[in-house]
Amino acid sequence: MKLRIFAFFMAVILCFGCISLFGCDNGKTDETTAEETTASAETTGEETTEAETDAPEIPDEGYDGSAVTIVFYHTMGQNLRNVLEAYIAEFNKLYPNITIEHSQVGGYDDVRNQISTEITVGNQPNIAYCYPDHVATYNISKAVYPLDALIANMAEVTRADGTTERMGLTQKQINDFIPGYYNEGKQFGDGKMYTLPLSKSTEVLYYNATFFAEHGLTPPTTWDEMEELCRRIKEIDPDCIPLGYDSESNWFITMCEQLGTPYTSATGEHFLFNTAENRSFVKRFRGWYENGYVTTQELYGAYTSGLFVAGAGEQKSYMSIGSSAGATHQRPTKENGAYPFEVGITTIPQVDSSNAKVISQGPSLCIFDKANKQEVYASWLFMKFLTTTVEFHAEFSMASGYVPVLKSVATNDIYAEWLSGADGGDGIAALSAKVCLDQVDAYYTSPAFNGSSVARDQVGLLIQDCLTATADDVDAMILQKFEAAVEKCKYLS
């Protein structure tokens, strides 16, 4: 009941905040020195009718050279801020009257929470890192500016060096985005585009390539192959847990996507995951857990990469499914100047390997509406500069471990040279990036709506509960837990 009262209170505040949105000064935050943190749950989105805005369409006019200050919230650590600042300097050569003030605001959840508070007094930034469910939350008060008219804007803008550029995106620029990443920005149910992708990650399967070679094992391409492989590995090393899977939530959501079964919907009834097919795959994975084939981050009590890189004499795993951006954490510590084993990386197992589906994660950028439309224009020009500059994406990817969102980055000379050093040792981050670039057609997103993050949390807990619960009637237990999870989603949303 307290949660319901709190949710109602926040909704009222956000609605009243919308009234004062256009009459207040821009929010500004001093830059911090905190290291980049990662979100506890990376969510992705498709659509929501609850995210509609009625922001006016921008006509074909452009930035007029006005002196404006643009506030940008992100989660970058110092190494990424160094890259950002170098490209802000390049941007200011073209637009010297646009001042960019950027601030590291903790992790992704911290960015969301701070902006949600600032929206209530019209003090939100101009640009921010975002996930789709963040946008759905901000748009309760219609705070995010739709990008469609900006993207289509044909006005020519004169830069400080005398050259001109189109305000909007060219078709060539649009085509250069990896489609799965670009389309995430317009899957909110109202047909509007709210975000552009900045940097992305996904899940990949890390495996002990040395162990696999010694025992004639082949990385699995399907979950059926994974089950048989776990059985064989368990025979070779009875004390091991063959597979670690970091994110229970991702596992559940990805299985729904691969199976083509319901998870959530942005319209109508939101929480659709209580189906016989979904209960069946959870029951199957319960059997894996009981056989000692698999563990997860919450069940293990830490990231499962700890099992994967464990040394001699420790319980270990030989496979780990985790973030592509965390490749260096899946590499063992050198012993006497050499790695104890080589790491292989491949696409996660599929229900149907000919129709692969892997989750899309990582931050996008959104623009917040302002009374002074020159701030909107300037924000757009900076967002466009960051998201379409190949050199920026190459440097940002190499510094962060995240995957570039532009196809052409792969042919950038510096980035191509970095990729050429991909291996299962010192070049493991490049190896992870290569796998991600090779599966660009497989990325999917899930519906984003006010409550989608609750669903994500609940299905993660559902996996944990169903794998570990004691029950004489397993089917009845799983059904009861699915029903309870759906009700919890409704209660908390």
Feature locations, PLM:
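Short, polar/charged alpha-helical segment
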Residues: 59, 77-99
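Glycine-centered hinge/linker elements that transmit conformational signals in sensory
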Residues: 229-232, 269-299, 348
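Mature extracytoplasmic/periplasmic domains
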Residues: 64, 83, 152, 325-334, ...
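Extracytoplasmic/periplasmic substrate-recognition and gating elements
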Residues: 93, 99-101, 121, 191-192, ...
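Extracytoplasmic "Venus flytrap"/periplasmic binding protein-like
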Residues: 90-176, 210, 214-218, 309-311, ...
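C-terminal capping/gating helix-and-loop segments adjacent to ligand/active sites or protein-protein/ligand interfaces
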Residues: 359, 423-487
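Hinge/lid segment of periplasmic solute-binding proteins
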Residues: 55-62, 133-202, 342-349
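Short, well-ordered beta-strand elements
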Residues: 66-77, 98-103, 127, 243
